[in-house]
């Protein structure tokens, strides 16, 4: 598809490109809608409850749709003491990078928007921009809880971005490329979760922290910060922050599938099943584990969060790079 889009420019290509972008947005919005429902159902099951069961039948299939409609009808309030331009701009800054990173993710061997030579670097660089929107929203709200939540988000991103990147370096060393398609191709014989188990563990933990998910949801800690950086937001502006969070859940689950679970490569002897199905199954498994974390683990303290990143994950990621370099030089 990307070869066709890169051919001679024309209005047809432009229209198709934006049409495919709109289609991807609809797919992601559908994922967000039912990821929220799945999260509520799974947590309800783990807590001995039924979960949503009224709107849209006994399974509550339209509960999230009803919640979104209710959210959009809420009053859009702006605090009197807020910095209005930045307050309005912050949700857009937070959401836009979350959708931009999807362009670099190959979902199958044939379906990808851009075959970027440094796709992994692109993802890491662009995803970090969301923190600017979070900090801006916290500061512009002129609220001490919002500001503290924004500063926590910045500190957490800086701390966990380093081990996340360094753990991904082991994958880059084995694949010999930062192109995500090449990384999937390099896992034709063995998935990198088996060749790089330590890197997978570090990357997964750092990814949970990057997503601000339990047990690392310090920027939004309800019991400490009254919802954190978006405490002063309501209506559709608050929805932008929530949407960014779940779009990143979509993107990070896809990235973990690409880097460590072989992407669309099948399990041995089951090659007759399409690659897109395998990608979806691995993707759903990662999303389920992230939901399971929320229903299982308590929130860690802020000091424990920082110490774990700098004193545990960072040294382990350095050890993994050295071991990978030695193994690469001796056996490959």
UniProtKB/Swiss-Prot annotation:
The keyword Translocase applies. It is found in: Cell membrane. It comes from the Bacteria. GO terms for molecular function: NADH dehydrogenase activity; oxidoreductase activity, acting on NAD(P)H, quinone or similar compound as acceptor; quinone binding. It is a multi-pass membrane protein. The keyword Acetylation does not apply. It catalyses: a quinone + NADH + 5 H(+)(in) = a quinol + NAD(+) + 4 H(+)(out). Keywords: Cell membrane, Membrane, NAD, Quinone, Translocase, Transmembrane, Transmembrane helix, Ubiquinone. Pfam families: NADHdh. GO terms for biological process: aerobic respiration. Belongs to the complex I subunit 1 family. NDH-1 is composed of 14 different subunits. Subunits NuoA, H, J, K, L, M, N constitute the membrane sector of the complex. This is NADH-quinone oxidoreductase subunit H.
């Amino acid at each position: 598809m990307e070869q066709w889009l890169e051919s001679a420019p024309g209005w047809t290509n432009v229209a198709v490109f934006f049409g495919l972008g709109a289609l991807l947005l609809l797919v992601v919005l559908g994922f967000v809608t039912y990821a929220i429902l799945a999260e509520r159902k799974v947590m309800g099951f783990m807590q001995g409850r039924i979960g949503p069961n009224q709107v849209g039948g006994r399974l509550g299939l339209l509960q999230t749709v009803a919640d979104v409609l209710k959210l959009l009808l809420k009053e859009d309030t702006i605090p009197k003491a807020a910095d209005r331009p930045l307050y309005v701009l912050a949700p857009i800054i937070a959401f836009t990078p979350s959708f931009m990173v999807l362009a670099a993710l190959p979902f199958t061997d044939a379906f990808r928007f851009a075959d970027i030579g440094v796709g992994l670097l692109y993802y890491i660089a662009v995803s970090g921009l969301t923190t600017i929107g979070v900090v801006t929203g916290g500061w512009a709200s002129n609220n001490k809880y919002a500001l503290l939540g924004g500063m926590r988000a910045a500190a957490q991103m800086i701390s966990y971005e380093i081990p996340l990147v360094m753990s991904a370096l082991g994958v880059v060393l084995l694949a010999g490329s930062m192109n995500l398609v090449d990384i999937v191709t390099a896992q034709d014989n063995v998935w990198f979760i088996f060749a790089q188990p330590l890197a997978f563990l570090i990357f997964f933990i750092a990814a949970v922290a990057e997503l601000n998910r339990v047990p690392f949801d310090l920027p939004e800690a309800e019991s400490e910060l009254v919802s954190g950086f978006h405490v002063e937001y309501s209506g559709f502006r608050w929805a932008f922050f929530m949407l960014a969070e779940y779009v990143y859940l979509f993107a990070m689950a896809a990235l973990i599938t690409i880097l460590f679970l072989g992407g669309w490569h099948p399990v041995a002897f089951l090659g007759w099943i399409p690659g897109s199905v395998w990608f979806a199954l691995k993707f759903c498994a990662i999303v389920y584990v992230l939901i399971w974390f929320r229903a299982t683990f308590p929130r860690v303290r802020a000091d424990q969060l920082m110490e774990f990143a700098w004193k545990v994950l960072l040294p382990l990621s350095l050890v993994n790079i050295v071991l990978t370099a030695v193994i690469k030089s001796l056996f490959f």
